[in-house]
Design a protein with these regions (language model features):
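Conserved NTPase motor "head" modules and their coupling/switch loops across ABC/AAA+ ATPases, GTPases
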Residues: 2-127, 136, 140-156, 165-174, ...
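Walker B catalytic acidic pair
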Residues: 131-133
Length: 190
């Protein structure tokens, strides 16, 4: 009975693996471009997709781990265990990176996804939300990000922040049209 389930899980998992591999291949150069812009070319990022499927046929890997999986009560092998590995200078950002570097990675990945969507032909310019943008980032990175998104490539952007005094001069320096909305106790005002 488990053979049938595992065969199906492996067959569908391999399809997901292929789609993720193609997506990662497309995202990686965009991610590297945006991370380099955010860090002002001071750091060397890398992005790679790590999967059990890279070690051999997924069905055999899943079946080979069945005994251990039964003991612990869940599957240790399969597509659900895949990971998008992010490194800086060859070291995993998860273990070695600062909070600012980690946030820069996530923003670069978001910008890469945005770019990919924008050029996919399936949508016009997507709406971009940068939530709590300035938290954990130094002034240089914030400046790089705001200058980058202030151009015509990004369309409409929502930036949230908890400190209006910090936000106002940064936005004014872009010389772009913008509006600041205040949200206080659920009430929105200009």
């Amino acid at each position: 009975m488990l053979d049938i389930y595992e065969e199906e899980m492996a067959a569908e998992g391999e399809k997901i693996f292929m789609a993720r591999s193609v997506l990662t291949e497309k995202l990686t150069p965009l991610f590297q471009k945006y991370y380099s812009l955010i860090s002002d070319y001071a750091e060397e990022p890398c992005l790679s997709y790590v999967s059990h499927c890279q070690r051999g046929p997924l069905f055999e890997i899943i079946r080979g781990g069945r005994a251990k999986d039964r003991i612990i009560g869940h599957s240790l092998h399969g597509i659900h265990r895949d990971e998008l590995q992010m490194c800086l200078g060859g070291y995993p950002i998860r273990n070695e990176g600062s909070q600012g570097q980690t946030k820069s990675f996530l923003l670069a990945l978001k910008f890469a996804q945005f770019d990919l969507l924008r050029h996919s032909g399936n949508c016009k310019v997507p709406l971009l939300l940068l939530d709590d943008l300035f938290d954990k980032l130094d002034a240089s990175r914030v400046s790089q990000i705001v200058n980058m998104v202030a151009g015509n490539d990004f369309g409409q952007i929502f930036i949230t922040d908890t400190d209006r005094e910090r936000l106002a001069p940064i936005l004014a320096a872009t010389k772009q049209d913008y509006r600041v909305f205040n949200v206080k106790k659920g009430e929105i005002s200009l």
